From Swiss-Prot:
Coiled coil: none
Species classification: Archaea, Thermoproteota, Thermoprotei, Thermoproteales, Thermoproteaceae
UniProt keywords, alphabetically: Aminoacyl-tRNA synthetase, ATP-binding, Cytoplasm, Ligase, Nucleotide-binding, Protein biosynthesis
Organism: Pyrobaculum arsenaticum (strain DSM 13514 / JCM 11321 / PZ6)
Enzyme class: ligase
Motif 'KMSKS' region, residue numbers: 258-262
Gene transcribed to yield this protein: trpS
Annotated protein name in UniProt: Tryptophan--tRNA ligase
Length: 374
């Protein structure tokens, strides 16, 4: 994916050039016209879109116009459950909840425990499935009710997916998936077949509703290869093409392009206690100067600062965020003070999230699609 950065569904490395990535994938930048169309139907625009976290799409305008015609559609995203959830994972889910609330549509959420088992030589299947149930608590904690959220744990809920997946698999050649995902002769056949399952969920609402029901998929840009293939074969299977809305990666606390589960200090996890959260924030990389004197004299650079990045995520007030930006640039705001302000915001969010998360424990099966379909 270029000499300076790599972006695949399984690996993100280097400083990501998002415009270059857009050209390579062939997705479209999100325009002011499309944002205005969203505002027309939703009544407002979520800060994650206004502030550029979601920046690209495939046929986002189509799904909005489809909605305007009063036709049915659904939302779809997922999670590869290989460990605990951090804030970066939750960004598409937060927008997913907003869309569901604004438009009253159902959500299909895939937990790909099979994929993580196939991909990680050390991962036991029971471990991946266990993480699927744990991660589901974080999704439910965002406020979804079982009438709107349909969880699909691949190894537990395969029945409604499999007939679609085999039709999808028949349309995908080895050469196609090899070129798309970079599979090699040493790739196990589970991983090679897996894209059929992720694609299948994009077509599942049409099967369940017995009428064309396209999906909107808010997800990180690294998932685009799956949905390019889904769009390529949709017509041949008589399904509507899935539409997508792509986010950038959430900057790591270390200043790198993306949080990494392999470096716990690069991310804030939903189950981090408050002491750990504060420690991570206070030790985060910043766009500030080496000394307070230099900061006051020259100001900082919020554009490269993960602390400011997090303020944009957790402060809904545009004026407040802009004041932080300007005070940083002018030198009126020092990094230590800025970090403490951020800790207050994140601490409040996580305290409430953890409480809702624990209330969801033992209720995951109420949300599972195959349980509802029995």
């Amino acid at each position: 994916m270029g000499e300076d950065f790599v972006v695949t569904p399984w690996e993100v490395r280097g400083k990501v050039d998002y415009e270059k990535l857009l050209r390579q994938f062939g997705a479209k930048p999100l325009t002011a016209e499309e944002v205005a169309l969203l505002e027309k139907y939703a009544g407002d625009v979520h800060p994650l879109i206004k502030r550029g976290f979601f920046y690209a799409h495939r046929d986002f305008d189509f799904i909005l116009k489809w909605h305007g015609e009063g036709r049915p559609w659904a939302l779809y995203t997922g999670r590869g459950p290989s460990g605990p959830v951090h804030i970066g994972h939750m960004v598409p889910w937060i927008l997913l909840k907003w869309f569901s609330d604004k438009f009253g549509v159902e959500v299909y959420f895939q937990m790909t425990d099979d994929e993580k088992f196939f991909d990680d030589p050390e991962m036991k299947l029971e471990e991946a499935t266990g993480w699927a149930y744990e991660n589901a608590l974080d999704v439910i904690a965002l406020g979804f009710g079982p009438d709107k959220l349909h969880l699909i744990v691949d190894t537990k809920d395969i029945a409604p997916l499999y007939p679609i997946a085999v039709r999808v698999a028949k349309k995908l050649t080895w050469n196609t998936v090899k070129a798309t995902f970079g599979f090699t002769d040493s790739s196990n056949i589970g991983l090679i077949f897996y894209p059929s399952l992720q694609i299948a969920v994009a077509f599942l609402p049409t099967e369940l509703k017995k009428e064309p029901t396209p999906v909107l998929i808010p997800c990180a840009i690294d998932q685009d290869p799956y949905f390019r293939l889904a769009r390529d074969i949709a017509d041949s299977l008589s399904y509507p093409k899935p539409t997508t809305l792509y986010s950038k990666f959430i900057m790591a606390l270390t200043g790198e392009s993306k949080m990494s589960a392999s470096n716990p200090d690069s991310a804030i996890y939903t189950m981090d206690d408050d002491k750990t959260v504060k420690h991570k924030i206070l030790n985060a990389f910043t766009g500030g100067r080496p000394t307070a004197e230099e900061q006051r004299k020259y100001g900082g650079n919020p554009d490269i600062c993960p602390v400011f990045h997090y303020h944009m995520l957790f402060d809904p007030d545009d004026a407040s965020v802009e004041k932080i930006r300007q005070d940083c640039k002018s030198g009126a705001l020092l990094c230590g003070e800025c970090k403490l302000k951020l800790h207050e915001k994140i601490s409040k969010f996580l305290k409430e999230h953890r409480e809702r998360r624990e209330k969801a424990r033992g209720k995951v099966d109420e949300y599972r699609l195959s349980v509802k379909l029995k």
